[in-house]
Amino acid sequence: KYGMKFYFGLYDSGKYWDTGDMTWEVEDNKYVIDEVWENYGSKYKSFGGWYISGEISRATKGAIGAFHALGKQCKDISNGLPTFISPWIDGKKAIMGTTKMTKEDAVSVQQHEKEWDEIFDGIHDVVDACAFQDGHIDYDELDAFFSVNKKLADKYGMQCWTNAESFDRDMPIRFLPIKFDKLRMKLEAAKRAGYD
């Protein structure tokens, strides 16, 4: 009715979170992709693309193969509709499952670039965009990580989007809404980096 586009998020079996192995997601989604396209994608002009919902942060067992297989199946069945992923950056605020506020073994900008260069190299032909979640790094790290993200996306002909998290990871209560000043800092950093 309003000319908006809908991106369908693939099924998350939860097995990856328990095993660290993304190959399960490929098997479970083979049927989901076919069914969704048959019942919705082929019938509605608002169906704009696919969200490959396996969220990773680093070089993960089976991730390149899984993202490639899922992206290819989505594109093949839908005549090339766009696909995107939304990983997180393994920064010091990536502390799920712990009572700590930060962690010591956060990824460096250089290691992040190395790992995501390898991942993008293996998926860029079937994944059109990457929207890194921005909540796991500190505000003074935004420019460094965002500029690397944009550089890599440009290198591989992908779009670089932001996933501006609207909840606050700086609080011991998970998760309060973020103050607008903090959200604005993240959006302005994405703009400075030239995100699409």
Regions found by a protein language model. Name each.
Residues 1-196:
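Glycan-processing catalytic domains of CAZymes
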